[in-house]
Amino acid sequence: MRNWELSVSPSFLELCDQYVSLCESPSFSGPSCLNDMAPDDILGNCDLFAEAADALFPDCLLEEVEAASGLAFETNEEVEGFVFPDCPERPGQECRSCKQHREMSGDPSILCSLCYMRLTACFVYSPVSDVEDEEPTEGVAENSLKRQADSSLCSSSPKRFC
C-alpha cells in the first residue's frame, strides 16, 4: 500500500484565514431601536416595484385564476353547506344547527352541542368528583334537563357561551 501525502502551500492557508475572517460577523453594535434598522423611505422603495408587479400580475388575471380554481367565497361548496351555530334564547328551539341535526338523524328530540351544553350545564367543565347529596344518574333524564335549565344560576348566564 502506498501512502499519499498532501502538502498545502502556506499561501493557500493564508487565503483561507483571510476568507474566514471576512465571513465572520463583526461584533454587534446595532441601532438603539427597530425603527432605526429600516430606511425612512421604505414605502418609496416599494413604489419602484409596484408597476413591475402590476405588469406581471394584472387584476384580471388574478380574477380568472380565482374563478377557475373555485376558491372564491361565493362558490365554495363547503361554506355553503355549513350551518353556523345560533344562540337562541331557549336552547333547542329555533336553532338552525339543532334543526339540521334533527333532519339528518330523524330524531325530533336531538340537540346541537351548544344547546345541549346550555341545557345541561352552566359551565364548560364538569366536576372532578360526584356531589354526595345528588342521586346517581345512569342516563340523563328529561325532567333533570328541564330542572337544570330552569335553575337560577344557569338562566342568568347562558349568554356568556354564545
Curated annotation (Swiss-Prot):
<feature type="compositionally biased region" description="Polar residues">
    <location>
        <begin position="150"/>
        <end position="162"/>
    </location>
</feature>
<protein>
    <recommendedName>
        <fullName>Early E1A 18 kDa protein</fullName>
    </recommendedName>
</protein>
<dbReference type="Pfam" id="PF02703">
    <property type="entry name" value="Adeno_E1A"/>
</dbReference>
<dbReference type="GO" id="GO:0044003">
    <property type="term" value="P:symbiont-mediated perturbation of host process"/>
</dbReference>
<feature type="region of interest" description="Disordered">
    <location>
        <begin position="134"/>
        <end position="162"/>
    </location>
</feature>
<dbReference type="GO" id="GO:0006355">
    <property type="term" value="P:regulation of DNA-templated transcription"/>
</dbReference>
<dbReference type="InterPro" id="IPR014410">
    <property type="entry name" value="Aden_E1A"/>
</dbReference>
<keyword id="KW-0244">Early protein</keyword>
